[in-house]
Amino acid sequence: MKKGSLAIVLGSLLASGAFYTALADGMPMKQQHNNMGESVDLHFHYPIKGKQEPKNGHLVVLIDPKIEANKVIPENYQKEFEKSLVLQLSNVLERKGYSVSQFKDVSEIPQDIKEKALLVLRMDGNMAILKDIVGENDATNEEKVIDMSSGYLNLNFVEPSSEDIVHSFGVDVSKIKAVIERVELRRTNSGGFVPKTFVHRIKETDHDRAIKKIMNQAYHKVMVHITKELSKKHMERYEKVSSEMKKRK
């Protein structure tokens, strides 16, 4: 072998050894950084499609959501989640030509509003995030520790005066996962060129990042279901049922 070729080969081997040594020593290599994950912000926004419809003369009342959350979810995250849901739900209805009023509770709706309103929309349910759930995958020799959601949200369309339910549906927000720790790297280097297995553990201990990722996905899932239920075809059916209920009073 020529001297130039030998130098290139030895240089490549030394570079590989330096790379694996860097992993073992915990240096901030690019691959490690990517596995740790980038920062995550709360993003409670869903793109609302469709043109602005003319006013249809109907009033819809929104009741502030009542979502119970476990202690893992910060209260300000929960409040922001609920606030964004009401705001975007109001935007969807207004774009479809409805007027919208908002109250904290059904009991606060004045009698004249009850008589005038077509529907009352109220949302309740629960949401929790479970921490440090361990799962193994023997096929890939990888162990993962995850945070995972649990919960179910309900949306009820109610006739204002009688409070009879016109329509209801639920959204399952459970089993949304975010990985916080994994065993994923193997190297073969024992100081020379004799292979030896070494497992390298990369850990992401930022539960706050995982909570944000899970809640962002849950919000998107809820809004997808809500926009489907508020389609023109569905709303016309709710209007018909609610009007018939008012006549039977």
Model regions: which residues?
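Short secondary-structure boundary motifs at beta->alpha junctions and helix caps
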Residues: E142-I146, E159-V224
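A structural "domain/chain start" motif
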Residues: Y20-G97, H200, E204, D208, ...
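Bacterial N-terminal signal peptides that target proteins for export
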Residues: M1-V9
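Surface-exposed short loop/turn segments
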Residues: Q111-R182
